[in-house]
């Protein structure tokens, strides 16, 4: 058994990939599923859609690879983080749609907690800030708004889990209720210093401990699938949240290594080693991975809108038919125009953390057209990455002693235009790897490590291969002018916040 099956459950689709022992890809399957937007700022998924699409893609990938369950050494799971599911322990029936990480409905709960002065203590325990992004307030909302849910939870009848936990519970036929440290660290309920669920936080958010899963290493024995799913049992041996899995897939095992993933949003992680680094620039302190009971930490910056801004160009404005058209269109833009898009469609993430502001375009003229809008959209992702980059360099103690090279992955990195502009604005090299499926690869590696298919991290890192290095080519004067314009645009958006 030299094959590993990776489940990559994302915000808009579920994917399954079969990896060989040399980390080459044997098969890929993908299935999209709908998102639901019942109110402004609300984003939901049907848990059954998540489950069904996951099982179907796994079966499809196995069929494409010509493999059976007996050929698979282990399954690794990576998932959209923070997305929250609450279900009945006895029936497996979800009591509410999954509340997605992008969802902002708990902004008022968060504002109240902040006003009561809880954020410093919460941040010290979790490494996070109080924000609707994280799972804790989503759980509280479900318990308070679904009739009878709180009473059922207090009687021990309901379970909570992030998507990995929910899938594991279903895959194992309800026998295993567990997660890993990376996903637990995104809930606002987990103490990243003790590695335990925190009773003070549970009391603050009124979440019964009986709802919570067991927390394990990222590479561990998570049980086996029921035989009926794939024609035989397969052990589940690795779990990590999508951004941590990408960090592993990018082989960022050394402190000071940084990766940025461009999907629906953009997420940058900087490995800080065995010591959690407290940010002075509104970054998050999180767990990068946990192996053999040892936690490795990271600084993280989260941008809510990246690839979804390109989807807006396609679906909202209709100026492109396919995402791949965006770069060539942007290349035709008028260089004399300075158009800035601040894509705060669901608020702003790091380092601003304002859930109330909304997006805006600046610098429009009568001559502004589709090319300029495409240019501004792609550039907005680069500017937001610059904000994270600058904050990480300020927070990381060794930044002055070493140049951080950024490793990138995700759908948007296929755009040479965007990656070159990113290198220009960062004034630093940007490395795109040969294997772009780094998130799935990270999940596969964790499972394969436990199953004996893959070697220890240091040796695994030797397999990382560079596809292209983008080097900065923009003049310092142009760079500073463009960054100053971006700063003014963000300031304008933040000034529009009336605190309502």
Swiss-Prot record:
HAMAP family: Glycerol_kin
Described function: Key enzyme in the regulation of glycerol uptake and metabolism. Catalyzes the phosphorylation of glycerol to yield sn-glycerol 3-phosphate.
Listed PROSITE patterns: FGGY_KINASES_1, FGGY_KINASES_2
Name of protein: Glycerol kinase
Lineage: Bacteria, Pseudomonadati, Pseudomonadota, Alphaproteobacteria, Hyphomicrobiales
Organism: Bradyrhizobium sp. (strain ORS 278)
Residue positions binding ATP: 11-13, 264, 307, 311, 411
InterPro entries: ATPase_NBD (IPR043129), Carb_kinase_FGGY (IPR000577), Carb_kinase_FGGY_CS (IPR018483), FGGY_C (IPR018485), FGGY_N (IPR018484), Glycerol_kin (IPR005999)
Gene assigned in the entry: glpK
Keywords: ATP-binding, Glycerol metabolism, Kinase, Nucleotide-binding, Transferase
Keyword S-adenosyl-L-methionine: no
């Amino acid at each position: 058994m030299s094959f590993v099956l990776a489940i990559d459950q994302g915000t808009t689709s579920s994917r399954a990939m079969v990896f060989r022992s040399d980390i080459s890809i044997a098969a890929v399957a993908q299935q999209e599923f709908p998102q639901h937007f019942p109110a402004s700022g609300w984003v939901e998924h049907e848990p059954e859609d998540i489950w069904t699409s996951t099982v179907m893609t796994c079966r499809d990938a196995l069929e494409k690879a010509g493999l059976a369950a007996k050929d698979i050494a282990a399954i690794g799971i990576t998932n959209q983080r923070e997305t929250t599911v609450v279900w009945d322990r006895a029936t497996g029936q979800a009591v509410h749609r999954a509340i997605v990480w992008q969802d902002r409905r708990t902004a008022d709960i968060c504002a109240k907690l902040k006003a009561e002065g809880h954020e410093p203590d919460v941040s010290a325990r979790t490494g996070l800030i109080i924000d609707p992004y994280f799972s804790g307030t989503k759980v509280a909302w479900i318990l308070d708004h679904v009739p009878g849910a709180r009473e059922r939870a207090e009687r021990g009848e309901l379970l909570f889990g992030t998507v990995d936990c929910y899938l594991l519970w279903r895959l194992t036929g309800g026998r295993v209720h567990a997660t890993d440290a990376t996903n637990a660290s995104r809930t606002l309920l987990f103490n990243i210093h003790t590695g335990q669920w925190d009773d003070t936080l549970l009391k603050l958010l009124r979440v019964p401990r009986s709802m919570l899963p067991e927390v394990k290493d990222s590479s561990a024995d998570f049980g086996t699938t029921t035989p009926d799913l794939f024609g035989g049992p397969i052990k589940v041996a690795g779990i990590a949240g999508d951004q941590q899995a990408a960090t592993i897939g990018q082989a960022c095992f050394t402190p000071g290594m940084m990766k940025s993933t461009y999907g629906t949003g953009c997420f940058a992680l900087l490995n800080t080693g065995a010591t959690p680094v407290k940010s002075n620039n509104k970054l998050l302190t999180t767990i990068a991975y946990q192996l053999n009971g040892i936690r490795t930490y990271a600084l993280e910056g989260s941008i809510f809108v990246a690839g979804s801004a390109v989807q807006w160009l396609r679906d909202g404005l209709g100026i492109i038919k396919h995402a791949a058209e965006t770069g060539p269109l942007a290349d035709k833009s008028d260089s004399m125009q300075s158009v800035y898009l601040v894509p705060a469609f669901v608020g702003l993430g790091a380092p601003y953390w304002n859930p109330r502001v909304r997006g805006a375009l600046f610098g429009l003229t009568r001559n502004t057209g589709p090319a300029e809008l495409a240019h501004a959209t792609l550039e907005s992702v680069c500017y937001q990455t610059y904000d994270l980059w600058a904050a990480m360099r300020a927070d990381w103690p060794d930044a002055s002693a070493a140049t951080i090279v950024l490793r990138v992955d995700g759908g948007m990195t296929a755009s040479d235009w965007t990656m070159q502009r990113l290198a220009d604005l960062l004034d630093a090299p940007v490395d795109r790897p040969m294997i772009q499926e780094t998130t799935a690869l990270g999940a596969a590696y964790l499972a394969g490590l436990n199953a004996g298919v893959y070697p220890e991290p240091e040796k695994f890192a030797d397999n990382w291969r560079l596809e292209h290095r983008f080097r900065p080519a923009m003049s310092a004067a142009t760079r500073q002018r463009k960054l100053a314009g971006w700063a003014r645009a963000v300031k304008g958006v933040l000034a529009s916040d009336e605190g309502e």
